[in-house]
Amino acid sequence: VSIHFNHTIVACHDAAASAQFWADMLGLEVGPPYGPFLPVTVDNGVTFDFAVAPGTVQDIPTAHYAFLVSEEDFDKGFARIQERGLRYWADPHAQREGEINHNDGGRGVYFFDPNGHALELLTVPYGGWPES
């Protein structure tokens, strides 16, 4: 079986601002619009398609998005978090503010986008790298 994750829609209040925030924080580019969507594409070809959610602020279901990054990209991403003065945590429950975690011998950090989605940067997958 060959199954690959292709895309997901990220609900937001302002597609252009939200896509640009993610692109800036991840060191990526916002792609050309596709219908009502503004895509941000990661290295494996998966797109995060930003679309304005109908309704009010309370209507956007927030989600958690984790990105496995290199040590160098973690450093760059963490620097962007600090440059913007964003709050960040070492855990998904926002209990360890101002810390990064060192789970499985790597580093990880959580922060929120303007829509309340939790973004995570981590350098080692949870459970560690599979043994060859």
Describe the residue ranges of each PLM region.
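Short, charged/polar surface micro-motifs in flexible loops or helix N-caps
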Residues: 44-47, 56-59, 70-75
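Vicinal oxygen chelate
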Residues: 15-16, 66-114, 118, 126-129
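Conserved beta-strand in the GNAT
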Residues: 48-51, 110, 119-122
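Short glycine-enriched loop/turn motifs at secondary-structure junctions
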Residues: 2-4, 58-62, 102-103
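Exposed loop/turn and edge beta-strand positions of beta-sandwich/beta-sheet ligand-binding modules
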Residues: 34, 63, 105
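A short, sequence-level motif marking secondary-structure junctions
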Residues: 52-57, 126
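Hydrophobic adenine-recognition pocket in adenosine-nucleotide-binding enzymes
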Residues: 8, 65
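Core segments of cupin and vicinal oxygen chelate
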Residues: 9-48, 54
